[in-house]
């Protein structure tokens, strides 16, 4: 497994295993250290397995349903929904390739698969993580253009597909050096104790083998900048601009408000809260893992600290990062009314308050996540003397913003249902 995403691929095994129920024997003047096959007691391993199983199920079910809904419903073939579809696909790859192998890495010693699987799994893991992060940026850019610059031409479906191809191309290019350097290596001074009958086995590990340690540091720094720091900066800046723009227009809706004006103002508040949620989730999910990886490469930690970090803290950091792929379907999909209705329609779920299918079809066509007309305002609006429909805070200078707020409220994750 690529050591960028696993937890135990340290080059200093003597630091990790020191004091971890090891025995030393001398063979041909070589100090052999025996380590247990299972890294944890059954109770601790059970906690790891149940925790990873939970996010794995959420990731697989949630992202599969999102893919099914977008592909099945033609009225949802829009720019933002295609980005959400791409996000779901990349998150599915995270669930398939990252979660199980990382869990295995956290509970057993060594690499149980061959050399080819070492390179393939490491490459796919890195690509899926990078593609997921880059897609979050693409969604932020799409929303930013629509809200802050509503008069600029909207992205077309063709442009969205080109963007998606670029996303995967960049992800492959960034992670290729890691795949090239990944090799399965034998741990000459360690053997795994397989049973109580003193049966042992050679320890193999899948890790990056750089010619110089400085090259590894440089590559880790490049990954940190391109997969975390730069995307985080872009997401925070663009969502801050979106929030400021919505807050500015919401200020015009103060004082005496008609019910519809109050409703639009509340929608703006919900969107602003949603934007803060997106940025905070991204920061909190990935910051611990990147902090640990940078610490591992740039600091000299004591053997005891290294052991604690690799055996206990790294698994939690990976779990937290993978949680982002599990909650993405919720915050980007199921808080969207179209996705909820599509879910009900796809699986023929009848609820007491469900509207007739004809009404849903009409509403779904009107609620397309991103449209180019800018004239589809869902709420009742007032009319000016010239006959133009205007909502609170909407003027001839910005006739599309209320439409975009409606769409943002539908298309994006919201903390308020």
Swiss-Prot record:
It is found in: Cell membrane. Residues 1-45, 104-119, 182-217, 296-310 are extracellular. One of its GO terms (biological process) is G protein-coupled receptor signaling pathway. One of its GO terms (molecular function) is neuropeptide receptor activity. The keyword Ubl conjugation does not apply. GO terms for cellular component: actin cytoskeleton; plasma membrane. Keywords: Cell membrane, Disulfide bond, G-protein coupled receptor, Glycoprotein, Membrane, Receptor, Transducer, Transmembrane, Transmembrane helix. The chain crosses the membrane at residues 46-66, 83-103, 120-140, 161-181, 218-238, 275-295, 311-331. Glycans are attached at residues 8, 20, 31, 198. It is a multi-pass membrane protein. The keyword Cell membrane applies. Belongs to the G-protein coupled receptor 1 family. Receptor for NPAF (A-18-F-amide) and NPFF (F-8-F-amide) neuropeptides, also known as morphine-modulating peptides. Can also be activated by a variety of naturally occurring or synthetic FMRF-amide like ligands. This receptor mediates its action by association with G proteins that activate a phosphatidylinositol-calcium second messenger system. This is Neuropeptide FF receptor 2. It comes from Mus musculus.
């Amino acid at each position: 497994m690529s050591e960028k995403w696993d937890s135990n691929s340290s080059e200093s095994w003597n630091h990790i295993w020191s004091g971890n129920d090891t025995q030393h024997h001398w063979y041909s003047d070589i100090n052999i250290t025996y380590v247990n096959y299972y890294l944890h007691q059954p109770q601790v391993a059970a906690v790891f397995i149940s925790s990873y199983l939970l996010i794995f199920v959420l990731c697989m079910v949630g992202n599969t349903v999102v893919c099914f809904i977008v592909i099945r419903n033609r009225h949802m073939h829009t720019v933002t929904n295609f980005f959400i579809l791409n996000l779901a696909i990349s998150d599915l790859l995270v669930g398939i390739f990252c979660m199980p192998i990382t869990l295995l890495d956290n509970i057993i010693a060594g690499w149980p698969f061959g050399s080819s699987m070492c390179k393939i799994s490491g490459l796919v893991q890195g690509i899926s993580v990078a593609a997921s992060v880059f897609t979050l940026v693409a969604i932020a850019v799409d929303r930013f253009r629509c809200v802050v610059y509503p008069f600029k031409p909207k992205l077309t479906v063709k442009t969205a597909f080109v963007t998606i191809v670029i996303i995967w191309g960049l992800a492959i290019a960034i992670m290729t050096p890691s795949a090239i350097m990944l090799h399965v290596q034998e741990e000459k001074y360690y053997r795994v104790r397989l049973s109580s009958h003193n049966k042992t086995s050679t320890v193999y590990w899948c890790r990056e083998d750089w010619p110089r340690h400085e090259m590894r540091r440089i590559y880790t720094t490049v990954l940190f900048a391109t997969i975390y720091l730069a995307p985080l900066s872009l997401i925070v800046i663009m969502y801050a601009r979106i929030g400021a723009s919505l807050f500015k227009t919401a200020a015009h809706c103060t004082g005496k408000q008609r019910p519809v004006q109050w409703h639009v103002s509340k929608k703006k508040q919900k969107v602003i809260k949603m934007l803060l949620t997106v940025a905070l989730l991204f920061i909190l999910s990935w910051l611990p893992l990147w902090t640990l990886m940078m610490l591992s490469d740039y600091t000299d930690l004591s053997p005891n600290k290294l052991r604690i970090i690799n055996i206990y803290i790294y698994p939690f950091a990976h779990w937290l990062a993978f949680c982002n792929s599990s909650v993405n379907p919720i915050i980007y999909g199921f808080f969207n009314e179209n996705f909820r209705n599509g879910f009900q329609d796809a699986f023929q779920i009848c609820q007491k308050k469900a509207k007739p299918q004809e009404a849903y079809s009409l509403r779904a066509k009107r609620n397309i996540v991103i449209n180019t007309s800018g004239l589809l305002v869902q709420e009742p609006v007032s009319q000016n003397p010239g006959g133009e429909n205007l909502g609170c805070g909407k003027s001839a200078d910005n006739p599309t913003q209320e439409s975009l707020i409606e769409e943002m409220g539908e298309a994006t994750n919201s903390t308020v249902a």
